[in-house]
Regions:
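Conserved small/polar residues in nucleotide/adenosyl-binding loops
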Residues: 1-5
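A short glycine-rich, Lys/Arg-flanked "PGG" loop and its adjoining helix->strand segment in the class I
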Residues: 119-131
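Class I SAM-dependent methyltransferase SAM/SAH-binding core
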Residues: 39, 47-92
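C-terminal lobe and adjacent flexible extensions of AdoMet/dcAdoMet transferase-like proteins
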Residues: 200-248
Length: 248
């Protein structure tokens, strides 16, 4: 278990998963996707999976962290929604059949360790994608890593949890940012317990991402500036890619 698993929901309270699901649903309809079997890849604690299930999708959700999935299963118990959760690394995805739509949200692909692993993950999605099916994902851009995360430090004060997020831009070909988290959780006696963790995120230019999609056997349908239907810009901090598996 990584410490992010324990604090994930509290540190992402600013995210409206309902809005995220509605945005992805809009893209699915716009690009001719079927409202049928949907895979939520790297689903985390299942908040987005829950929203897709409420919208009528038949949802399968995977994550490499059993701790995250335990939180997701707690939500499933409360909601009663028929979501199937599987503990799988996205580079080793293994489905029982083909999937109509795969969603990978909240820059999950950026958390992979290398370009090779990113290609493996995209290849796996393509392998299990129904012909005519879609793969929609968002990623942080090299621009964001170089100019926004860069060498900056961010602080999150959430009453019972205090988080210091420190970035170090490595300047490597994969625009790697090394991230250090220091999380302080308030105990019942008012004192704080400190937890620490280090991890990295990688990012690639739009053209490189498009090459990886094409190498998997899928086509690039569109690339949008994050959370819009606007085209990608050179200063986009996040991009949304829509890929499709050809019918033949």
């Amino acid at each position: 278990m990584c410490i992010r698993d324990s604090f994930y929901d509290r540190l992402t309270l600013n995210i409206s998963y309902k809005d995220r699901a509605e945005y992805f649903d809009r893209l699915i309809k716009l690009h001719g996707g079927r409202k049928n079997l949907l895979l939520d890849l790297a689903c985390g604690t299942g908040s987005l999976s829950e929203e897709f299930a409420k919208m009528g999708y038949d949802v399968i959700a995977t994550d490499s962290s059993q701790e995250m999935l335990n939180c997701a299963l707690d939500k499933k118990f409360e909601s009663g929604l028929p979501i199937q959760y599987l503990c799988q690394d996205m580079t080793e995805l293994d489905m029982f059949g083909t999937i109509d739509v795969t969603i990978c949200a909240l820059d999950s692909l950026n958390h992979l360790s290398s370009k090779e692993d990113m290609q493996k993950a995209i290849n796996k999605v393509s392998l299990f994608c129904e012909p005519g099916g879609l793969f929609i994902f968002d990623v942080n851009t090299p621009y964001k890593h170089k100019n926004i995360l860069a060498e900056n430090t961010y602080v999150y004060d959430l009453d019972d949890v205090y988080c210091v997020w420190q970035n170090s831009f490595a300047g490597t070909p994969d625009s790697r940012v090394n991230i250090t988290l220091d999380i302080f959780e308030r105990d019942d006696d008012g004192r704080f317990t400190r937890y620490g963790e280090e991890f990295s995120e990688i990012a690639f230019e739009k053209s490189v991402m498009e090459e990886m999609i094409k190498a998997s056997g899928m086509t690039v349908e569109a690339v949008y500036d994050y959370d819009t239907l606007d085209p990608a810009r050179t200063d986009s901090e996040k991009l949304v890619f829509v890929a499709k598996k050809p019918l033949v």
